[in-house]
Amino acid sequence: MTDGHDVVNPEGLPHPSGFNHAVVSAGGRTVWLAGQTALDHHGVLVGGGDVVVQFDQALRNLLTVLGAAGGHPEHLVSMTVYIVDLDDYRAHAGEIGQVWRRLVGTDYPAMAAIGVARLWDADALVEVQGIAVLPA
């Protein structure tokens, strides 16, 4: 990238096309994490119509990218969750919260949940995107 920004595209995730999984700013330690869906490392969507399984995989993917950039879950400062079916997501909020606590703990960044008509992958139910600030 220009201006010395570093891109992060870790092994274990599908090779990105038209985006990077993360960008680390050259002037600081801010990491912008690209949206992640429930794709496995072969680029196959997992979880079928199960929003909890898809959230679990999408969050795991985001945390994989964050780790490859040198960060940890507690470095997340903002996260946006894009959801195809808000009613289904809310109906499973308790289970989704359990996934969060298992993978991240009880640190919560600033968050927004946004309902969308569909995601890039037509079968994806949820996508997570984040920003992290790493210690200097």
Model-found features: residue ranges?
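N-terminal presequence-like segments and the immediate start of the first folded domain
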Residues: 1-60, 64-77, 83-136
